[in-house]
A protein has these predicted regions:
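Extracellular/luminal recognition modules and glycoprotein regions
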Residues: 1-7
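Aromatic-patch recognition
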Residues: 8, 13-132
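Strongly charged, low-complexity linkers/loops
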Residues: 126-146
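Long, compositionally biased interface segments
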Residues: 139-162
Length: 162
């Protein structure tokens, strides 16, 4: 996300370290330098959280679009009985040779993709927020109450994430 390294704190199960860090959203890892050498911090269960400026990143298990379960870094937006997370991502677009009418080549580029939002209730699995209905379905004992509230307040997914 950022080319420059920023002061950050890595909290693991056994210790706390201050490092110059930056988050690589394309590869979903943190990069830091030790004696001028670049190192990486892959998401693993030993990492409790990483504070980078105003943001707190935590490691959570999730299922990718391809159905593969893996660990990744998520920005913690809100915590309590239910936790709200965002997943930052960057997409790579390969370069293309210009065609007759295009007028030139298209260079390869990395482009920031919209954040994906997730929630987790009482230690359950991470659930992606795709729509208000899917979020309400995750609370079977409060479904009617939440549906009525969403209708009354005219809640859209954008409102949930603000």
């Amino acid at each position: 996300l950022d080319e420059t390294y920023v002061d950050g704190i890595i909290l693991t199960a056994s210790n706390t370290r201050k490092e110059q860090l930056r988050y690589n959203a394309y590869r979903d890892l943190f990069e830091f330098k030790v004696d001028g050498q670049a190192r990486v911090l892959d998401p693993s269960t030993t990492i409790k959280k990483v504070n980078l400026g105003e943001e707190t990143f935590v490691v959570e298990k999730y299922v990718t679009d391809k159905g593969i379960a893996k660990y990744g870094y998520f920005t913690l937006l809100d915590s309590g009985k239910a936790n709200l997370f965002s997943k930052k991502s960057v997409k790579f677009t390969p370069g293309m040779k210009g065609r007759a009418l295009d007028g030139g080549d298209q260079p390869a580029e990395y482009r920031r993709a919209p954040d994906e939002f997730y929630f987790k209730v009482n230690g359950s699995d991470l659930v992606e927020i795709r729509s208000v209905k899917s979020m309400i379905a995750a609370f079977p004992d409060k479904q009617e109450e939440l549906s009525a509230f969403a209708r009354k307040e005219k809640i859209s997914p954008r409102n949930i994430l603000k």
